[in-house]
């Protein structure tokens, strides 16, 4: 027995009852609903063409308005919706369960950005706070372990707060810790009505590697996002690039600031012991500043080894057009070419020697015009197919 028009509010009252400060909607008494049905993809596909749900998907539950009771279970072998595929999904929620309120498990979750396997999430309510515990594996090889503890609550101003307790994850063979000192600073405070977000200091630590992030967003008018890196290894976060292995230790800052219509993105970074394909190039310094835009930047880059600059480049990068444009002046002094030999693959190899000179790079970023002169010293290369060296 239930009023169809009041069913959403009855369900919301049952879920909201776990919060002590929840103000329920007024609904008619003695409303309840028991349901148990099987979902057929043919029906779903008519209304949502981009959604696939396995025909063996079952949904079962119970709602009781007078008892503020809400129970729901969902089991599905496979759901594919909007580019995300979930296999062996099991979802349980019971707002009267004293051990946990929600349980979610899945064998696999595939997205365009990252794949997850063996997902297990539990949720429980305590006073006005929802606590979550989530364990899963990530990555294509399923060798990246995540152990996350986080919470959701409201502060004294009525704003939502999403925060992390001490958590850890393994990414690219590095064990990272979130909120390692348990100071309760790693959290996001937000208000969806005003579209305001405040990021308290987020801290990621892995040995000597440290990443700190703070910021705030106020609608579309103000953005302040600040990231600091301390001794972060490039190989701990960079994806694999064919024939190009980059190593080094990153330190510096990356800032994005937008206030009163003025854009001021800026980066000041240093990569110590910068290596390309296991050849040490020295220390790389990179300074980038937005020209009142987040699409056009002035750039200054150089590599220094033993107080000598082997390469320096300065100019502008413009991403405002459909095809990005570059305008750079480049200087080389005894720049070693050996590191780029793997780029030739089977066509050419044994690239060697040094290059010195000046030239410009102007035009489309993907294929710029080069103008200048280079002097090669002790240079050479090999064409394996022709047996010419």
Describe the role of every protein-language-model region.
Residues 1-389:
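Interface amphipathic segments
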């Amino acid at each position: 027995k239930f009023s169809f028009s009041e069913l959403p509010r009855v369900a919301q009252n049952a879920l909201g009852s776990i919060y002590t400060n929840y103000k329920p909607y007024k609904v008619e008494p003695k409303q309840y609903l028991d349901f148990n049905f099987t979902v057929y993809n043919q029906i779903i596909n008519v209304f949502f063409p981009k959604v696939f749900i396995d025909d063996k998907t079952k949904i079962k539950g119970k709602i009781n308005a007078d008892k503020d009771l809400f129970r729901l279970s969902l089991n599905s072998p496979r759901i594919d919706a909007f580019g995300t595929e979930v296999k062996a999904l099991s979802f349980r929620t019971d707002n009267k369960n004293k051990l946990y309120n929600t349980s979610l498990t899945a064998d696999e979750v595939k997205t365009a950005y990252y794949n997850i396997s063996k997902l297990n999430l539990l949720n429980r309510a305590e006073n006005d706070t929802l606590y979550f515990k989530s364990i899963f594996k990530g990555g294509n090889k399923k060798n990246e372990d995540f152990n996350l503890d986080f919470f959701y609550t409201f502060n004294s101003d009525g704003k939502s707060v999403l925060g992390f307790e001490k958590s850890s994850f393994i990414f690219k063979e590095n064990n990272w810790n979130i909120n390692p000192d348990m100071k309760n600073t790693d959290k996001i405070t937000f208000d969806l009505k005003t579209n305001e977000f405040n990021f308290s200091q987020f801290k990621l630590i892995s040995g000597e590697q440290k990443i700190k992030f703070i910021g705030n967003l106020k609608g579309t008018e103000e953005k302040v996002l600040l990231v600091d890196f301390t001794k972060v290894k490039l190989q701990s976060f960079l994806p694999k690039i064919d024939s190009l292995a980059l190593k080094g230790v990153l330190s510096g800052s990356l800032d994005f600031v937008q206030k009163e219509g003025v854009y001021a993105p800026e980066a000041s970074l240093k990569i110590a012991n910068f290596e390309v394909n296991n050849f040490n190039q020295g220390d790389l310094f990179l300074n980038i500043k937005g020209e009142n835009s987040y699409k056009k930047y002035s750039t200054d880059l150089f590599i220094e080894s033993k107080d000598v600059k082997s390469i320096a480049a300065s100019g502008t990068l413009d991403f405002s057009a459909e095809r990005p444009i570059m305008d750079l002046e480049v200087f080389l002094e005894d720049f070693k070419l050996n590191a780029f030999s793997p780029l030739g693959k089977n066509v050419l190899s044994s690239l060697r020697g040094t290059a010195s000179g000046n030239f410009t790079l102007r035009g489309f970023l993907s294929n710029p015009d080069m103008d200048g002169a280079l002097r090669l010293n002790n240079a050479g290369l090999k064409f394996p197919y022709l047996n010419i060296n």
